[in-house]
Every structure is written in C-alpha cells, then in structure tokens.
C-alpha cells in the first residue's frame, strides 16, 4: 500500500467543518467521495486536525493509503477536476509508510483576520471579522505576550477538544511559540499564532477574549487572570469562525 499526503486549501463558508458527518457537507467527506471514485473502493482520509464550520485553510494536510497506480500528479489533476471550486489540492506527495498527517505534526500556524475600515468590501465579509470601531492595539499586544510560552489553556478550551487516547499526559497544556497582531493590507490586520498544538476553538476563544480588552470592555489584568483560572467561564466569548484560517502545519 502507498501512503499519499495531500496539501489542501479550502473555503469553509458552506461546509460543516473538516470532519465527515452524516447528513452534513464537510471537507473530508467531499474529498473521500472523490477518492472512492478514483480507486473504486472506500478510502479513509486522515487530516492533521479538525476545523469547525466556517473556518478556512491555506495549508491543511491529510493522508490516505491506497494500492492504486495513479501518480501523484494524476491524483492532483483528477481531484481538482472533480472537487468543488471551494476545495483545491495544492500538492500531492508519496510519504513513508509510517507517516501520519496528525500524529507526525510538530506544530500549526493559525491566522485570525480583521477588517478595520468603515465599510467592509463584500468579497471580504466571509473571511474577515469587521471591527469598525478603533481598538487598543497596545493592550492587545500585551495580552499576546502573556500567552507566549507553555501554559494550561483550559480557560480557552471548548468541550470535546482533546482526544483522550492521544493527550500524551499534556492535558490542556500547550506551547505558543509566536503570537502577534499585525497589518497585512490597508485596513486589514491579523492575529498570528504558532504553537505545538491547539485545543478546540482555542484560537477563537483567545481572540474573542483579547478583543474584549481591545474594545475596552476588559483589562489586560483580567485577561492574565482568566488564563490563570483554568476555567472557560473566566474568559471571553468565542470569536466568529469566518475570520479564522489554518495557515500551515509543521512537520
């Protein structure tokens, strides 16, 4: 059997997340259905993680095993021809037998995007959170500095985020290597998070809490204490899904 790895970009607007579900349109489900047509048998696609409904990706990775003789280029061309335009296969590679897209990953990079102008262009409304009023960037940068390093992120963890068979004794402890807020276009900013792993909705919960500080509703001290509490109820709201993008997975 061959072990094939896909590099995938997708627009998650019209999908119920990555993971295959009964009676729901998902990224994994769409790709597996096309792989079945190409190989004339059921194929299980294993992703590097699970994105929620409405979340986008520039660099999701996933692998599957197959005995088909199709080349990597053949797979890429065929899948892109068969898949909806919202899902693109950027690269196809044959990997070692023991490669696993999820368990071999050493880290991930997520971006959360904001549009800060008065009127958001229609083509950006599905991919950026509109923050029309000015926000305190200095206070938000201080919050970002607080989460860099190794911490218990229970306060920013939603229920069901951990696979109990794969915790490795870490629980809700994760290491954030980089966390910053920066401009990338006119009136366009993003939070950038790079870490060894992320809990369910962790990025969106962190962003939602930091925006509470940026909007003047809470203080930097409140954010720092929320992290220490290890209690989801101590932190702020979950930021909307459409601003979040999985940028890349590290190996």
Curated annotation (Swiss-Prot):
One of its GO terms (molecular function) is tRNA pseudouridine(38-40) synthase activity. It is an enzyme of class 5 (isomerase). The active site is at residue 52. Substrate binds at residue 110. It comes from the Bacteria. One of its GO terms (biological process) is tRNA pseudouridine synthesis. Belongs to the tRNA pseudouridine synthase TruA family. Formation of pseudouridine at positions 38, 39 and 40 in the anticodon stem and loop of transfer RNAs. This is tRNA pseudouridine synthase A 1. It comes from Desulfotalea psychrophila (strain LSv54 / DSM 12343). The lineage of its organism: Bacteria, Pseudomonadati, Thermodesulfobacteriota, Desulfobulbia, Desulfobulbales. The gene is truA1.
